């Protein structure tokens, strides 16, 4: 009787184990490539571009579900990051001056020469927002600064919390900075991942230019390389939507 019971328990255990392995192979294993890839790119950008440590990136950026499975290593000499999940699906992200951090595959030739965009940064001696100098101190009588500062303070997590994860808040009124605050480890020179906020601000600036009559977003995008093929039909409005046209579901809990 005991032998029969043990055999039955063993069979049940074996079936459950097989089901678990099948689930891991079908549902989880394909995600490992994305997890290690995301982690490698995140660490490379945060470390080589913003100068943050691996520890702070792992605790403040990559401490999200599944991404925290990854193990990351930084190669300072050759400026790249490798990430893998329990030894599986290793991915590499490289840093190149002028291009930033790029996730690469096994066929990528790191030694291959590359072109760097020519970016001309013009500095002038005017105060913010018209130049690079510090803004002039201005106090507005119609602003309740105590209430404003309380609102800004409330945008950040209290010590030990990770609910809001706000990195920075800046409030501008009549071209003057009236409130400014940063999370620990960040300052006005930090290079912060913008996500969709970058897209929203870019679209806002083009909207202002359109209202001022200085730009028309429904015209073909002013890109010389696109003028003689089907891309000539792509407008600035299309680009501002940042939509690839691919059919996909924006669900970060599974593969789209």
Predicted stretch roles:
Residues 1-5:
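Short, Lys/Arg-enriched N-terminal segments with co-localized hydrophobic residues
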Residues 11-25:
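Hydrophobic membrane-insertion alpha-helices, especially the h-region
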Residues 30-52:
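Alpha-helical transmembrane signal-anchor/signal-peptide segments
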Residues 37, 49-91, 96, 104-108:
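Membrane-embedded, hydrophobic transmembrane alpha-helices
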Residues 83, 149-186:
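A short, well-structured edge-of-sheet supersecondary motif
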Residues 85-161:
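Non-catalytic propeptide/linker segments at domain boundaries
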Residues 175, 192-218, 239:
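Active-site SXXK
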Residues 211-247, 251:
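Active-site helix/loop module of the DD-peptidase/beta-lactamase fold
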């Amino acid at each position: 009787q005991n032998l029969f019971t043990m055999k039955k328990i063993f069979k049940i255990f074996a079936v459950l184990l097989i089901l678990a392995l099948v689930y891991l192979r079908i549902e989880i294993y394909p995600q490992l490539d994305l997890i290690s890839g995301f982690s490698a790119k995140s660490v490379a950008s945060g470390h080589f571009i913003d100068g943050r440590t691996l520890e702070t990136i792992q605790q403040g950026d990559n401490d999200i579900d599944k991404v925290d499975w990854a193990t990351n290593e930084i190669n300072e000499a050759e400026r790249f990051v490798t990430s893998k999940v329990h030894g599986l699906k290793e991915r590499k992200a490289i840093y190149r001056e002028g291009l930033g951090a790029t996730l690469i595959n096994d066929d990528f030739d790191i030694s291959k020469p590359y072109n760097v965009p020519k970016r001309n940064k013009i500095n002038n001696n005017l105060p913010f927002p018209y130049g690079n100098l510090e803004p002039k101190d201005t106090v507005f009588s119609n602003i309740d600064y105590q209430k404003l500062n309380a609102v800004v303070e409330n945008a950040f997590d209290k010590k030990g919390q990770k609910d809001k994860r706000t990195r920075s808040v800046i409030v501008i009124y009549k071209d003057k900075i009236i409130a400014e605050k940063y999370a620990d480890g960040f300052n006005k020179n930090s290079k912060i991942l913008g996500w969709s906020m970058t897209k929203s601000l870019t679209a806002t600036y083009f909207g202002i230019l359109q209202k001022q009559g200085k730009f028309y977003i429904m015209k073909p995008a002013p890109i010389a390389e696109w003028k003689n093929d089907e891309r000539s039909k792509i407008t600035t409005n299309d680009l501002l939507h940042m939509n690839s046209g691919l059919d996909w579901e924006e669900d970060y809990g599974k593969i789209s």
